[in-house]
Curated annotation (Swiss-Prot):
The keyword Membrane applies. Keywords: Disulfide bond, Fusion of virus membrane with host cell membrane, Fusion of virus membrane with host membrane, Glycoprotein, Host cell membrane, Host endoplasmic reticulum, Host membrane, Host-virus interaction, Membrane, Oncogene, Signal, Transmembrane, Transmembrane helix, Viral attachment to host cell, Viral envelope protein, Viral penetration into host cytoplasm, Virion, Virus entry into host cell. It holds the Pfam family TLV_coat. It comes from Friend spleen focus-forming virus (isolate 502) (FSFFV). The chain crosses the membrane at residues 385-405. This is Glycoprotein 55.
Length: 409
């Protein structure tokens, strides 16, 4: 009796490359997690390229993260048209041609996502009306899903000679290259969330009432460079004197001045020793002291009993106040650098000093109470005794009243 065809041993079905594939996936995931920190700063370069001529219309570099490095890009329409544009006679070779280009509206169609019927590169992805997503035209083309918006700059159409300053330097208003058709490219919300791992392409067409609208195409590319190894986070190298906090200075009463002895030469007072630079501990304690003073001035009722803690998480040290009894609030906050404070100030010496201050506060509280109220606080059993005696007296009084009422009736 023959066995089924799929009854081979299990070891023959195991892929020998399986462990290596799993290891490669884990390594790749670890690398991606290491380099995909949203706070890492890169050198980001955006480049606008005329695909008809291969020339760069704009190249802008800046430092930023992958979520905020989206600047406005400024370039000229003639950088996309070139010296000669198709067979329509439009060109940017002469001042007159550049000035004429300012009189036309334009519209832009995306090539990275081409809707049905919008054509290909030959049509500039604008094969029919409705494919345009942005531009500067009387019908105001727009889109809610495209990655960019492209509009004219703030130069009015009826101003500017469009003369090249390198050729006609004596003409007022001449610009480098005769550029007088400024464009502004902005990233939309969809563009800031999109993936820019590969270039994105758009088609641009000048609108003419009659004839064929001339076509050009441009691409937008992002290049990301690592600015170098990350600097480890640690103590500020500028702050010198990483010293522990100094002990509080004991205040001494000034001694009365003594007259100099007779015949003694007058002594020139020496210069005072320079004050010691505060250490790191003093700086941190000053932060807590400042937080206490601000809290005591703004909300004095909240400084009756509170804990002020140094939160060591970047980017700042913060004062945290917790109201309540003198329980272990610091463990709930998971802090190791907390100071108890009340209206008398911060306690920074030791827990013994803290207990002493709490004892003084308790004595002050008890001294403000009457003897009867204080007896209840000092003797817990006294409350139970009084309650028991009062209960028995009330029962006896009720029995006596019931007995008198029975005899009377």
């Amino acid at each position: 009796m023959k066995g089924p065809a799929f009854s081979k041993p299990l070891k023959d079905k195991i892929n020998p490359w399986g462990p290596l594939i799993v290891l490669g996936i884990l390594i790749r995931a670890g690398v991606s997690v290491q380099h995909d920190s949203p706070h890492q700063v890169f050198n980001v370069t955006w480049r606008v390229t005329n695909l008809m001529t291969g020339q760069t219309a704009n190249a802008t570099s800046l430092l930023g993260t992958m979520t905020d490095a989206f600047p406005m890009l400024h370039f000229d329409l003639c950088d996309l048209i070139g010296d000669d544009w198709d067979e329509t006679g439009l060109e940017c070779r002469t001042p007159g041609g550049r000035k004429r280009a300012r009189t036309f509206d334009f519209y832009v169609c995306p090539g990275h996502t081409v809707p049905t019927g919008c054509g290909g590169p030959r049509e500039g992805y604008c094969g029919k009306w409705g494919c345009e997503t942005t531009g500067q035209a009387y019908w105001k083309p727009s889109s809610s899903w495209d990655l960019i918006s492209l509009k004219r700059g703030n130069t009015p159409k009826d101003r500017g000679p469009c003369y090249d300053s390198s050729v006609s330097s004596g003409v007022q208003g001449a610009t480098p290259g005769g550029r007088c058709n400024p464009l502004v490219l902005k990233f939309t919300d969809a563009g800031k969330k999109a993936s820019w791992d590969s270039p994105k392409v758009w088609g641009l067409r000048l609108y003419r009432p009659t004839g064929i609208d001339p076509v050009t195409r441009f691409s937008l590319t992002r290049q990301v460079l690592n600015i170098g190894p990350r600097i480890p986070i640690g103590p500020n190298p500028v702050i010198i004197g990483q010293l522990p906090p100094s002990r509080p200075v004991q205040v001494r009463l000034p001694r009365p001045p003594q007259p100099p002895p007779t015949g003694a030469a007058s002594m020139v007072p020496g210069t005072a020793p320079p004050s010691q630079q505060p250490g790191t501990g003093d700086r941190l304690l000053n932060l807590v002291q400042g937080a206490y003073q601000a809290l005591n001035l703004t909300n004095p009722d909240k400084t009756q009993e509170c804990w002020l803690c140094l939160v060591s998480g970047p980017p700042y040290y913060e004062g945290v106040a917790v109201l309540g009894t003198n329980s272990n609030h610091t463990s709930a906050l998971k802090e190791k650098c907390c100071f108890y404070a009340d209206h008398t100030g911060l306690v920074r010496d030791s827990m013994a000093k803290l207990r002493k201050r709490l004892t003084q506060r308790q004595k002050l509280f008890e001294s403000s109470q009457g003897w009867f109220e204080g007896s209840f606080n000092r003797s817990p059993w006294f409350t139970t005794l009084i309650s028991t005696i009062m209960g028995l007296l009330i029962i006896l009084l009720l029995l006596l009243i019931l007995l008198l009422w029975t005899l009377h009736s």
